[in-house]
Amino acid sequence: MSFSISGKTAIVTGGANGIGLAIGRHFADKGANVMFADMDEARLVKELGENKEDSNIRYFAGDLREKLTLANLLSATIDAFDQVDILINASRQVVPSDPLNPDDDAVEMLLQQNLMTSLRLTQLVAKRMIKQAEGREKGMAGTIVNMSSIAARRTHPDLLAYSVSTAALDQMTRSLAVALAPHRIRVNAVAFGSVMSASLKDTLRDNRSFRSDIEEHTPLGRIASPTELAEAVQYLSCDGSGFMTGQIMTVDGGRSLLDPVAAPAH
């Protein structure tokens, strides 16, 4: 059983900061070719430097909500590395929402950002993976990992939009796993709790009490580093998880195991 991703080519969205950047760097360190994709070109250049033809790291800047941009991302990846074996949908947005405000468009916005962008890119990349595998009878054609959240199955009034979008992403993961299995493409997701991402850093900076609240309600008593999440994503991307598809792997330090009601009564 191999956990290696060396020589594989991966597209990682949300690659300019936080979780996406950590996953992309981890994959590159493990010998994979990585295309970092994000809207923030200045941040991509700052973190990765200029694109170099002899490097296993490239970046692509553009608005992934646009279909043409998605097609151009795939073309740029093929031009750089000739193939694509792994897709990591790590582009996501978290915004508060008002569940009683009919003018609040957060649900529509996050469904577009967190669900539809991943769905459209997955469809394009899956077609390419199927084409690459033509004439090859053994082995997987590719693997896709979606970055989800435990918010998909927990509730908080201010996170209605985020919870809805990640729950939809989980169902997309399961549905595509069944649809793509005959083509030897695996689709899984990682549902994470609190990870020290760029967005969480901003939140904790503005709300200092949140950190102790998170840590107290996480059995392992801390917030995960992006690198810890990257290790889980590597596992789902490698041959070692070759019989896993349609699964939502939880990486939350045990947080989702706790009952918020302290009283030992039902």
Annotated model-derived regions:
Residues 127, 178-182, 242:
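Alpha-helical segment proximal to the catalytic Tyr-Lys
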Residues 100, 154-160, 182, 221, ...:
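Active-site loop immediately N-terminal to the catalytic Tyr-X3-Lys motif
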Residues 3-35:
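Canonical Rossmann dinucleotide-binding motif of NAD(H)/NADP(H)-dependent dehydrogenases/reductases
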Residues 234, 245-266:
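Short C-terminal tail/terminal secondary-structure segment
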Residues 98-111, 214:
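Substrate-binding pocket helix/loop in short-chain dehydrogenase/reductase
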